């Protein structure tokens, strides 16, 4: 055997390693939850517009000297947020908000590298089981799309607005949560394959799609609450400023505009749709328990209860930053736990897939 053939992908190939792939995806899922948390801090500290350019490579390093800091600060001074809200901000104040946006972007890159590098390695070693290559590629590509959506979101606040579009913020957050769910689902499939080489991948049931739809609405409303700062319109619970249906809803532009843009109405809907989401998830937990998956059922009940309590605490605290961040982090954990629960109840039938 020649040296060149010894180094070829075919000769270095190993048997598929679904267990190792599953552990890798679980680690990346944890990273995604961390990024979601830092994203919440970035939003709540109003740091998201502090970096006015998208430099995927050169932007890795922060300003390294005073001249670089002044240059970055001058760029920030050109956007409406500085002129209308932060006029007079000191360089020290700018450095504080710059840090969180920079960290959020760096962690996003870390997630990207944590997917791309192992994926290329496992693909080169031919260690990816048949039927999973396309799925792992899609998850890896989704990180790149998420980065582009993040910049698209930031760009919405650089010219005419003092904040980002709540529609784009929702797209950014929901894409991250979709990625998280995909990582968990695929990790569970690979874990099952590691235990049983003949295990087929799980498929969503009709009931599962219904649960996802209900949860999706709640997550969308939560993202809009965040993007519109709607959490601040009421700090009382269960009533909103002594009313069940809050005063202050602007219906002048029509019902659809109010439904998608009015902070009072969106806060109200997020507050009460949470009970529909909780009910659907508790029914899911009941089904899990009846089918012997008591650990998954207990985990789901605990996370649902924690998220409901954190939501109420966020309201009555007047959107205390760390409480609100925990609400966002536990929301991400809830997505992961729900994905795992739905996978446990998924349909399984032997099918032929292509890698």
UniProtKB/Swiss-Prot annotation:
Record key words, sorted: Cell membrane, Heme biosynthesis, Iron, Membrane, Metal-binding, Oxidoreductase, Transmembrane, Transmembrane helix
Subcellular location: Cell membrane
Regions that span the bilayer: 21-41, 85-102, 136-156, 173-193, 208-228, 264-284, 299-319, 322-342
Superkingdom field: Bacteria
UniProt KW Cell membrane keyword: yes
EC main group: oxidoreductase
Pathway where this protein functions: Porphyrin-containing compound metabolism; heme A biosynthesis; heme A from heme O: step 1/1
Name of the protein in its database record: Heme A synthase
Provenance organism: Sphingopyxis alaskensis (strain DSM 13593 / LMG 18877 / RB2256)
Gene: ctaA
């Amino acid at each position: 055997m020649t040296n060149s053939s010894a180094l070829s992908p075919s000769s270095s190939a190993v048997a598929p390693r679904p267990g190792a792939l599953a552990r890798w995806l679980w680690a990346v899922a944890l990273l995604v939850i961390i990024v979601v948390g830092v994203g919440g801090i970035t939003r709540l500290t109003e740091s998201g517009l502090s970096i006015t350019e998208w430099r995927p490579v050169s932007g890795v390093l922060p300003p390294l000297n005073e001249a670089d800091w002044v240059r970055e600060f001058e760029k920030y001074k050109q956007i409406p947020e500085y002129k209308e809200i932060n006029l007079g901000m000191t360089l020290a104040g700018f450095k504080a908000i710059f840090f969180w946006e920079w960290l959020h972007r760096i962690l996003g890159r870390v997630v990207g590298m944590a997917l791309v590098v192992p994926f290329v390695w496992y693909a080169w070693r031919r260690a990816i089981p048949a039927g999973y290559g396309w799925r792992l590629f899609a998850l890896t590509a989704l990180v790149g799309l998420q980065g582009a959506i993040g910049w698209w979101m930031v760009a919405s606040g650089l010219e005419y607005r003092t904040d980002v579009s709540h529609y784009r913020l929702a797209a950014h957050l929901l894409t991250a949560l979709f990625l998280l769910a995909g990582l968990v689902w695929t990790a569970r499939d690979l874990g099952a394959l590691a235990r049983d080489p003949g295990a087929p991948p799980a498929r969503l049931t009709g009931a599962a799609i219904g649960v996802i739809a209900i949860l999706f609405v709640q997550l969308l409303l939560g993202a809009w609450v965040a993007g519109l700062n709607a959490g601040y319109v009421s700090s009382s619970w269960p009533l909103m400023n002594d009313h069940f249906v809050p005063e202050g809803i602007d219906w002048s532009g029509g019902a659809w505009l109010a439904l998608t843009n009015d902070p009072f109405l969106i806060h109200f809907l997020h507050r009460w749709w949470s009970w529909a989401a909780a009910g659907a998830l508790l029914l899911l937990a009941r089904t899990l328990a009846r089918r012997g998956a008591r650990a998954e059922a207990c985990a789901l009940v605990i996370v649902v209860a924690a998220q409901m309590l954190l939501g109420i605490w966020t309201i009555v605290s007047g959107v205390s930053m760390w409480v609100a961040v925990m609400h966002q982090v536990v929301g991400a954990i809830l997505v992961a736990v729900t994905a795992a629960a739905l996978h446990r109840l998924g349909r399984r039938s032997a099918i032929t897939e292509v890698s």
